[in-house]
Protein backbone atom coordinates (compact mmCIF):
# COMPACT_ATOMS: atom_id res chain seq x y z
CA UNK A 1 0.00 0.00 0.00
CA UNK A 2 1.02 3.60 -0.41
CA UNK A 3 0.87 6.24 2.32
CA UNK A 4 -2.80 6.95 1.59
CA UNK A 5 -3.64 3.38 2.56
CA UNK A 6 -4.69 2.42 -0.96
CA UNK A 7 -2.98 -0.24 -3.03
CA UNK A 8 -0.23 0.70 -5.48
CA UNK A 9 -1.03 0.69 -9.19
CA UNK A 10 0.95 -1.34 -11.67
CA UNK A 11 0.64 -2.21 -15.36
CA UNK A 12 -2.36 -4.31 -16.42
CA UNK A 13 -6.11 -4.12 -16.81
CA UNK A 14 -9.25 -5.60 -15.34
CA UNK A 15 -12.99 -5.33 -15.54
CA UNK A 16 -14.50 -2.95 -12.99
CA UNK A 17 -17.79 -3.89 -11.36
CA UNK A 18 -18.60 -0.31 -10.44
CA UNK A 19 -20.84 0.18 -13.49
CA UNK A 20 -23.07 -2.03 -15.60
CA UNK A 21 -21.03 -1.23 -18.69
CA UNK A 22 -17.51 -2.56 -19.01
CA UNK A 23 -14.88 -0.11 -17.86
CA UNK A 24 -11.16 -0.68 -17.63
CA UNK A 25 -8.95 0.06 -14.66
CA UNK A 26 -5.24 -0.54 -14.22
CA UNK A 27 -4.45 -3.60 -12.14
CA UNK A 28 -2.91 -3.32 -8.69
CA UNK A 29 -0.30 -5.32 -6.80
CA UNK A 30 0.11 -9.09 -6.66
CA UNK A 31 -1.34 -11.00 -3.73
CA UNK A 32 2.09 -11.64 -2.26
CA UNK A 33 2.71 -7.88 -2.04
CA UNK A 34 -0.20 -7.26 0.33
CA UNK A 35 0.12 -6.59 4.02
CA UNK A 36 -1.45 -9.23 6.24
CA UNK A 37 -4.00 -10.07 7.36
CA UNK A 38 -5.86 -8.98 4.22
CA UNK A 39 -9.38 -9.68 2.99
CA UNK A 40 -9.37 -11.16 -0.52
CA UNK A 41 -12.33 -11.27 -2.89
CA UNK A 42 -12.21 -13.24 -6.15
CA UNK A 43 -14.06 -11.08 -8.66
CA UNK A 44 -14.76 -13.82 -11.20
CA UNK A 45 -16.19 -16.13 -8.54
CA UNK A 46 -18.43 -13.37 -7.17
CA UNK A 47 -19.72 -12.71 -10.68
CA UNK A 48 -20.37 -16.42 -11.23
CA UNK A 49 -22.10 -16.88 -7.86
CA UNK A 50 -24.39 -13.90 -8.34
CA UNK A 51 -25.29 -14.96 -11.87
CA UNK A 52 -26.09 -18.54 -10.83
CA UNK A 53 -28.26 -17.56 -7.88
CA UNK A 54 -30.11 -15.01 -9.98
CA UNK A 55 -30.78 -17.63 -12.64
CA UNK A 56 -31.95 -20.07 -9.99
CA UNK A 57 -34.44 -17.57 -8.56
CA UNK A 58 -35.78 -16.93 -12.05
CA UNK A 59 -36.19 -20.66 -12.74
CA UNK A 60 -38.08 -21.08 -9.47
CA UNK A 61 -40.40 -18.21 -10.40
CA UNK A 62 -39.57 -15.93 -7.48
CA UNK A 63 -38.31 -12.38 -7.27
CA UNK A 64 -34.76 -11.94 -6.00
CA UNK A 65 -34.19 -9.37 -3.27
CA UNK A 66 -30.61 -10.22 -2.32
CA UNK A 67 -29.20 -9.60 1.13
CA UNK A 68 -26.11 -7.39 1.11
CA UNK A 69 -24.95 -7.91 4.70
CA UNK A 70 -22.26 -10.42 3.74
CA UNK A 71 -20.18 -7.98 1.68
CA UNK A 72 -21.72 -4.55 2.48
CA UNK A 73 -20.36 -3.04 -0.77
CA UNK A 74 -21.97 -1.16 -3.63
CA UNK A 75 -19.93 -3.10 -6.19
CA UNK A 76 -21.08 -6.56 -5.13
CA UNK A 77 -24.67 -5.39 -4.67
CA UNK A 78 -24.76 -4.16 -8.26
CA UNK A 79 -23.70 -7.61 -9.41
CA UNK A 80 -26.42 -9.18 -7.26
CA UNK A 81 -29.26 -7.10 -8.70
CA UNK A 82 -28.12 -7.09 -12.31
CA UNK A 83 -30.98 -8.42 -14.41
CA UNK A 84 -33.44 -8.23 -11.51
CA UNK A 85 -35.81 -5.60 -10.16
CA UNK A 86 -33.18 -3.88 -8.02
CA UNK A 87 -34.49 -4.25 -4.48
CA UNK A 88 -32.11 -5.34 -1.72
CA UNK A 89 -32.13 -6.51 1.90
CA UNK A 90 -29.99 -4.99 4.66
CA UNK A 91 -29.28 -5.80 8.30
CA UNK A 92 -28.49 -2.32 9.68
CA UNK A 93 -29.76 1.20 9.14
CA UNK A 94 -26.17 2.22 8.37
CA UNK A 95 -26.29 -0.23 5.47
CA UNK A 96 -29.65 1.16 4.38
CA UNK A 97 -28.32 4.73 4.31
CA UNK A 98 -25.14 3.68 2.50
CA UNK A 99 -26.97 1.79 -0.23
CA UNK A 100 -29.56 4.55 -0.54
CA UNK A 101 -26.70 6.96 -1.25
CA UNK A 102 -25.44 4.42 -3.79
CA UNK A 103 -28.66 4.58 -5.78
CA UNK A 104 -30.68 1.67 -4.37
CA UNK A 105 -34.32 2.72 -3.97
CA UNK A 106 -36.20 -0.30 -2.56
CA UNK A 107 -34.72 -1.64 0.67
CA UNK A 108 -35.95 -4.10 3.28
CA UNK A 109 -34.42 -3.72 6.75
CA UNK A 110 -34.59 -7.36 7.80
CA UNK A 111 -34.22 -7.03 11.56
CA UNK A 112 -37.22 -6.37 13.82
CA UNK A 113 -37.27 -2.61 14.32
CA UNK A 114 -36.92 -1.31 17.91
CA UNK A 115 -38.89 1.86 18.68
CA UNK A 116 -35.66 3.77 19.42
CA UNK A 117 -34.61 3.43 15.77
CA UNK A 118 -37.91 4.54 14.28
CA UNK A 119 -37.03 8.26 13.87
CA UNK A 120 -33.90 7.33 11.90
CA UNK A 121 -35.81 4.82 9.80
CA UNK A 122 -38.63 7.27 9.11
CA UNK A 123 -36.20 9.96 7.97
CA UNK A 124 -34.42 7.46 5.73
CA UNK A 125 -37.71 6.31 4.20
CA UNK A 126 -38.22 9.79 2.73
CA UNK A 127 -35.09 9.28 0.61
CA UNK A 128 -36.28 5.99 -0.85
CA UNK A 129 -39.09 4.69 -2.98
CA UNK A 130 -39.67 2.18 -0.21
CA UNK A 131 -38.06 1.19 3.07
CA UNK A 132 -39.76 -1.87 4.51
CA UNK A 133 -39.55 -2.58 8.24
CA UNK A 134 -40.08 -5.79 10.21
CA UNK A 135 -42.07 -6.29 13.37
CA UNK A 136 -43.39 -9.21 15.39
CA UNK A 137 -44.73 -7.43 18.48
CA UNK A 138 -47.91 -5.47 19.13
CA UNK A 139 -46.13 -2.79 21.18
CA UNK A 140 -43.73 -2.19 18.30
CA UNK A 141 -46.66 -2.09 15.89
CA UNK A 142 -48.19 0.71 17.96
CA UNK A 143 -44.88 2.59 17.96
CA UNK A 144 -44.42 2.23 14.18
CA UNK A 145 -47.96 3.45 13.55
CA UNK A 146 -47.52 6.42 15.89
CA UNK A 147 -44.23 7.36 14.23
CA UNK A 148 -45.85 7.30 10.79
CA UNK A 149 -48.88 9.27 11.99
CA UNK A 150 -46.78 11.98 13.64
CA UNK A 151 -44.68 12.48 10.51
CA UNK A 152 -47.54 12.28 8.06
CA UNK A 153 -46.04 9.34 6.16
CA UNK A 154 -46.90 5.72 5.46
CA UNK A 155 -44.34 3.17 6.56
CA UNK A 156 -44.06 -0.19 4.83
CA UNK A 157 -44.15 -3.17 7.17
CA UNK A 158 -43.62 -6.93 7.03
CA UNK A 159 -44.77 -9.28 9.77
CA UNK A 160 -41.81 -11.46 10.75
CA UNK A 161 -42.74 -15.15 11.03
CA UNK A 162 -40.91 -17.95 12.84
CA UNK A 163 -40.71 -20.97 10.54
CA UNK A 164 -38.52 -23.03 12.84
CA UNK A 165 -35.32 -21.08 13.51
CA UNK A 166 -36.76 -19.75 16.81
CA UNK A 167 -34.76 -16.54 16.68
CA UNK A 168 -37.48 -14.01 15.90
CA UNK A 169 -40.97 -13.91 14.48
CA UNK A 170 -44.54 -14.66 15.41
CA UNK A 171 -45.80 -18.21 15.79
CA UNK A 172 -47.92 -18.83 12.67
CA UNK A 173 -50.13 -21.22 14.59
CA UNK A 174 -51.40 -18.64 17.09
CA UNK A 175 -54.56 -16.57 16.76
CA UNK A 176 -52.63 -13.61 18.19
CA UNK A 177 -50.40 -13.69 15.11
CA UNK A 178 -53.40 -13.39 12.83
CA UNK A 179 -54.74 -10.56 14.97
CA UNK A 180 -51.43 -8.68 14.79
CA UNK A 181 -51.36 -8.98 11.00
CA UNK A 182 -54.92 -7.70 10.84
CA UNK A 183 -54.06 -4.82 13.15
CA UNK A 184 -51.16 -3.73 10.93
CA UNK A 185 -53.07 -4.35 7.72
CA UNK A 186 -55.96 -2.14 8.75
CA UNK A 187 -53.85 0.87 9.79
CA UNK A 188 -54.23 3.97 7.59
CA UNK A 189 -50.62 4.89 8.41
CA UNK A 190 -48.97 1.59 7.52
CA UNK A 191 -48.50 -0.24 4.23
CA UNK A 192 -48.68 -3.93 5.13
CA UNK A 193 -46.49 -5.73 2.60
CA UNK A 194 -47.02 -9.28 3.80
CA UNK A 195 -45.06 -11.90 5.71
CA UNK A 196 -41.33 -12.59 5.89
CA UNK A 197 -39.20 -15.37 7.36
CA UNK A 198 -35.66 -16.72 7.44
CA UNK A 199 -34.99 -20.45 7.80
CA UNK A 200 -31.88 -20.05 9.89
CA UNK A 201 -32.18 -23.67 10.97
CA UNK A 202 -30.86 -24.61 7.54
CA UNK A 203 -27.36 -23.87 8.83
CA UNK A 204 -27.75 -26.72 11.32
CA UNK A 205 -28.30 -29.26 8.54
CA UNK A 206 -25.77 -31.95 7.69
CA UNK A 207 -26.22 -32.20 3.94
CA UNK A 208 -28.18 -30.92 0.96
CA UNK A 209 -30.99 -33.42 1.50
CA UNK A 210 -31.67 -32.06 4.98
CA UNK A 211 -31.50 -28.48 3.67
CA UNK A 212 -33.99 -29.37 0.93
CA UNK A 213 -36.43 -30.58 3.60
CA UNK A 214 -36.01 -27.30 5.51
CA UNK A 215 -36.66 -25.36 2.30
CA UNK A 216 -39.90 -27.26 1.72
CA UNK A 217 -40.96 -26.69 5.34
CA UNK A 218 -40.18 -22.98 5.10
CA UNK A 219 -42.32 -22.69 1.99
CA UNK A 220 -45.18 -24.76 3.42
CA UNK A 221 -45.34 -22.82 6.69
CA UNK A 222 -45.41 -19.46 4.94
CA UNK A 223 -47.91 -20.38 2.23
CA UNK A 224 -50.23 -21.93 4.81
CA UNK A 225 -50.00 -18.89 7.09
CA UNK A 226 -50.67 -16.54 4.18
CA UNK A 227 -53.76 -18.59 3.38
CA UNK A 228 -54.92 -18.31 6.97
CA UNK A 229 -54.46 -14.53 6.92
CA UNK A 230 -56.33 -14.18 3.64
CA UNK A 231 -59.24 -16.19 5.01
CA UNK A 232 -59.28 -13.68 7.86
CA UNK A 233 -59.57 -10.86 5.28
CA UNK A 234 -55.94 -9.74 5.69
CA UNK A 235 -54.35 -8.81 2.38
CA UNK A 236 -50.98 -10.50 1.84
CA UNK A 237 -49.12 -9.27 -1.23
CA UNK A 238 -45.69 -10.67 -0.44
CA UNK A 239 -44.43 -13.97 0.93
CA UNK A 240 -40.72 -13.36 1.44
CA UNK A 241 -38.41 -16.20 2.46
CA UNK A 242 -34.84 -17.12 2.12
CA UNK A 243 -31.40 -18.18 3.07
CA UNK A 244 -28.49 -19.18 0.91
CA UNK A 245 -28.69 -22.89 1.84
CA UNK A 246 -32.42 -23.22 1.13
CA UNK A 247 -32.39 -21.33 -2.15
CA UNK A 248 -29.31 -23.24 -3.29
CA UNK A 249 -31.20 -26.56 -3.21
CA UNK A 250 -34.95 -25.72 -3.22
CA UNK A 251 -36.97 -27.59 -5.84
CA UNK A 252 -40.37 -25.92 -5.59
CA UNK A 253 -41.27 -22.46 -4.26
CA UNK A 254 -44.87 -22.35 -5.43
CA UNK A 255 -46.77 -19.64 -3.57
CA UNK A 256 -43.63 -17.72 -2.55
CA UNK A 257 -43.12 -14.31 -4.15
CA UNK A 258 -39.63 -13.29 -3.00
CA UNK A 259 -36.31 -14.75 -1.83
CA UNK A 260 -33.50 -13.03 0.11
CA UNK A 261 -30.25 -15.05 0.04
CA UNK A 262 -27.02 -13.24 0.85
CA UNK A 263 -24.07 -15.43 1.80
CA UNK A 264 -23.89 -16.93 -1.71
CA UNK A 265 -21.92 -13.90 -2.92
CA UNK A 266 -18.88 -15.15 -0.99
CA UNK A 267 -19.91 -18.55 0.45
CA UNK A 268 -17.68 -20.00 3.22
CA UNK A 269 -16.49 -23.17 4.93
CA UNK A 270 -19.86 -23.84 6.54
CA UNK A 271 -21.67 -23.68 3.21
CA UNK A 272 -19.24 -26.24 1.78
CA UNK A 273 -19.79 -28.55 4.75
CA UNK A 274 -23.60 -28.56 4.49
CA UNK A 275 -23.67 -28.95 0.71
CA UNK A 276 -24.66 -25.47 -0.45
CA UNK A 277 -21.58 -25.03 -2.63
CA UNK A 278 -18.23 -26.47 -3.67
CA UNK A 279 -14.84 -25.20 -2.60
CA UNK A 280 -14.32 -23.53 -5.98
CA UNK A 281 -17.44 -21.40 -5.33
CA UNK A 282 -15.84 -19.60 -2.38
CA UNK A 283 -14.99 -16.01 -3.25
CA UNK A 284 -13.73 -14.70 0.11
CA UNK A 285 -10.60 -15.61 2.02
CA UNK A 286 -8.17 -14.01 4.44
CA UNK A 287 -4.50 -13.80 3.51
CA UNK A 288 -2.16 -14.53 6.44
CA UNK A 289 1.58 -14.97 6.94
CA UNK A 290 3.48 -17.49 8.99
CA UNK A 291 5.06 -15.66 11.93
CA UNK A 292 6.21 -18.67 13.96
CA UNK A 293 7.21 -22.28 13.26
CA UNK A 294 7.22 -25.07 15.88
CA UNK A 295 8.21 -28.43 14.34
CA UNK A 296 8.22 -30.30 17.67
CA UNK A 297 4.47 -29.90 17.94
CA UNK A 298 3.73 -29.73 14.19
CA UNK A 299 2.35 -26.21 14.48
CA UNK A 300 2.62 -22.90 12.69
CA UNK A 301 1.67 -19.48 14.00
CA UNK A 302 -0.01 -17.07 11.58
CA UNK A 303 -0.87 -13.39 11.86
CA UNK A 304 -4.60 -13.89 11.41
CA UNK A 305 -6.47 -14.19 14.67
CA UNK A 306 -10.02 -13.73 15.87
CA UNK A 307 -10.06 -10.12 14.63
CA UNK A 308 -9.44 -11.36 11.10
CA UNK A 309 -11.37 -14.64 10.99
CA UNK A 310 -13.93 -14.35 13.82
CA UNK A 311 -14.45 -17.16 16.32
CA UNK A 312 -17.50 -18.64 14.64
CA UNK A 313 -17.24 -22.35 15.55
CA UNK A 314 -18.36 -23.39 12.09
CA UNK A 315 -19.96 -26.69 11.06
CA UNK A 316 -19.01 -28.68 14.16
CA UNK A 317 -22.26 -30.64 13.77
CA UNK A 318 -20.83 -32.02 10.51
CA UNK A 319 -17.12 -32.08 11.38
CA UNK A 320 -16.33 -31.72 15.11
CA UNK A 321 -12.68 -31.05 14.31
CA UNK A 322 -13.30 -28.42 11.64
CA UNK A 323 -11.36 -25.72 13.44
CA UNK A 324 -11.69 -22.07 12.47
CA UNK A 325 -11.51 -22.27 8.68
CA UNK A 326 -10.11 -24.04 5.64
CA UNK A 327 -6.40 -23.61 4.94
CA UNK A 328 -5.37 -22.92 1.33
CA UNK A 329 -2.09 -22.06 -0.33
CA UNK A 330 -1.45 -18.47 -1.41
CA UNK A 331 -2.66 -19.52 -4.87
CA UNK A 332 -5.92 -20.85 -3.44
CA UNK A 333 -5.24 -24.60 -3.49
CA UNK A 334 -6.35 -26.73 -0.49
CA UNK A 335 -3.72 -27.94 1.98
CA UNK A 336 -5.12 -31.33 3.08
CA UNK A 337 -5.22 -32.01 6.79
CA UNK A 338 -4.22 -28.56 8.01
CA UNK A 339 -6.44 -27.16 10.74
CA UNK A 340 -6.64 -23.85 12.57
CA UNK A 341 -6.93 -25.21 16.07
CA UNK A 342 -7.04 -21.98 18.08
CA UNK A 343 -7.37 -18.24 17.72
CA UNK A 344 -6.47 -15.37 19.98
CA UNK A 345 -6.87 -11.71 19.11
CA UNK A 346 -4.06 -11.49 16.54
CA UNK A 347 -2.71 -15.04 16.45
CA UNK A 348 -3.86 -18.21 14.74
CA UNK A 349 -2.40 -21.64 15.49
CA UNK A 350 -2.29 -24.02 12.52
CA UNK A 351 -1.82 -27.73 13.20
CA UNK A 352 -0.09 -29.69 10.42
CA UNK A 353 -1.11 -33.32 9.74
CA UNK A 354 2.51 -34.47 9.45
CA UNK A 355 5.96 -33.61 10.73
CA UNK A 356 7.37 -30.38 9.33
CA UNK A 357 10.38 -31.01 7.15
CA UNK A 358 13.36 -28.66 7.09
CA UNK A 359 12.46 -25.50 5.22
CA UNK A 360 8.77 -26.38 4.88
CA UNK A 361 6.42 -23.41 5.47
CA UNK A 362 9.14 -21.02 6.66
CA UNK A 363 8.36 -17.79 8.46
CA UNK A 364 6.94 -15.40 5.88
CA UNK A 365 5.02 -18.11 3.99
CA UNK A 366 1.52 -17.15 2.88
CA UNK A 367 -1.77 -18.97 3.31
CA UNK A 368 -5.33 -18.10 2.48
CA UNK A 369 -7.89 -18.98 5.13
CA UNK A 370 -11.51 -19.59 4.15
CA UNK A 371 -13.44 -18.55 7.28
CA UNK A 372 -16.23 -20.59 8.77
CA UNK A 373 -18.57 -17.61 8.39
CA UNK A 374 -17.67 -15.11 5.69
CA UNK A 375 -20.28 -12.57 6.83
CA UNK A 376 -18.55 -12.19 10.18
CA UNK A 377 -15.00 -12.29 8.87
CA UNK A 378 -15.63 -9.78 6.08
CA UNK A 379 -17.17 -7.34 8.57
CA UNK A 380 -13.83 -7.21 10.40
CA UNK A 381 -12.13 -5.44 7.47
CA UNK A 382 -12.48 -1.89 6.19
CA UNK A 383 -11.42 -2.83 2.64
CA UNK A 384 -11.22 -5.87 0.39
CA UNK A 385 -8.48 -6.56 -2.15
CA UNK A 386 -10.38 -7.69 -5.25
CA UNK A 387 -8.56 -10.32 -7.32
CA UNK A 388 -8.47 -11.76 -10.77
CA UNK A 389 -6.16 -14.76 -10.66
CA UNK A 390 -3.45 -13.47 -8.29
CA UNK A 391 -3.59 -9.83 -9.36
CA UNK A 392 -5.32 -7.27 -7.16
CA UNK A 393 -7.48 -5.36 -9.63
CA UNK A 394 -9.68 -3.26 -7.39
CA UNK A 395 -10.42 -2.26 -3.82
CA UNK A 396 -13.92 -2.38 -2.36
CA UNK A 397 -14.84 -0.44 0.78
CA UNK A 398 -17.69 -1.92 2.85
CA UNK A 399 -19.95 0.15 5.03
CA UNK A 400 -19.45 -0.44 8.74
CA UNK A 401 -21.37 0.29 11.92
CA UNK A 402 -25.04 0.30 12.77
Functional labels for PLM-detected ranges:
Residues 156, 163-278:
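Active-site loop/helix belt of alpha/beta enzymes
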Residues 295-402:
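C-terminal accessory subdomain/extension
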Residues 46, 69, 99, 159, ...:
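Conserved, mostly hydrophobic/aromatic
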Residues 213, 245-327:
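Active-site loop ensemble at the mouth of alpha/beta enzyme cores that anchors a bound cofactor
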Residues 2-123, 396, 401-402:
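A charged N-terminal "starter" segment
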Residues 67-204:
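Active-site-proximal beta-alpha core segment in soluble small-molecule metabolic enzymes
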Amino acid sequence: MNKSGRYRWRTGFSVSTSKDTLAWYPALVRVEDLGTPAALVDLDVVARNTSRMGERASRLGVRLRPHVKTHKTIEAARLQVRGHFGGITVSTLAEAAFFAAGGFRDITYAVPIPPAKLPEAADLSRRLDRLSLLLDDSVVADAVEECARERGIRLSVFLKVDCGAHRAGVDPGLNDSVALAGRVGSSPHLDFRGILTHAGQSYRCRDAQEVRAVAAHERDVMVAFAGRLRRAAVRVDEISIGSTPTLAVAEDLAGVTEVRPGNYVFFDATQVAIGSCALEDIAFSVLVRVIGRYPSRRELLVDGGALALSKDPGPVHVDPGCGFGLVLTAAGEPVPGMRIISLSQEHGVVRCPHDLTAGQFPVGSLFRIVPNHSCLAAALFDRYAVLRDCDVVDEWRPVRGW
